[in-house]
Amino acid sequence: MTAVRRATVVGAAGFIGRHLCRHLQRQGFEVHEAARDERGWIDGPLGHVFYCAGLTADFAQRPHDTVDAHVSLLDRVLRPQRFHSLVYLSSTRLYDGSLAEAAVEDAPLTLQPGQPRHLFDLSKALGEALCHAAGGGRARVARLSCVVKDASDD
């Protein structure tokens, strides 16, 4: 008998999360689509967590929601350690202020708290740091770039 592979997708209602849920289901995962207003899902076994929650276009108008999505909720997932693995979706926007010619993962980041646009970058960087510091060696970060919709998307 094969063990059930469980996945929890945080941010399942968003563009990436929605497509990831479909992909995981096709791969035979039992997928829990964690909703923003749902309570209690953090208290159970989460399996493989894909952390897709976040704000993009309206982050500047919603600073508290941005920090909550990128950091606070992530902390509530990481703290009890009820996951097998976790992938935190970050962004290559963290490289925007870099003076380097090419973006590489270990390049120093130039983030300026006084710049309103850097709220997004700082909150994503803090989410990454939290994964590295509190992920128990089971959290990974993926910095995505240029996620687009193609003709086959609904």
Question: Model-derived features: where do they sit?
Answer:
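Flexible, glycine-rich beta-alpha linker
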Residues: 95, 118, 140-154
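Conserved Rossmann-fold NAD(P)-dependent oxidoreductase catalytic core, especially the SDR/UDP-sugar
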Residues: 75-119
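N-terminal Rossmann NAD(P)H-binding glycine-rich loop of SDR-like oxidoreductase domains
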Residues: 4-27
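Conserved glycine-rich Rossmann-like NAD(P)H-binding loop of the short-chain dehydrogenase/reductase
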Residues: 29-38
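NAD(P)H-binding glycine-rich loop region in Rossmannoid oxidoreductase-like domains
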Residues: 38-80, 92-97
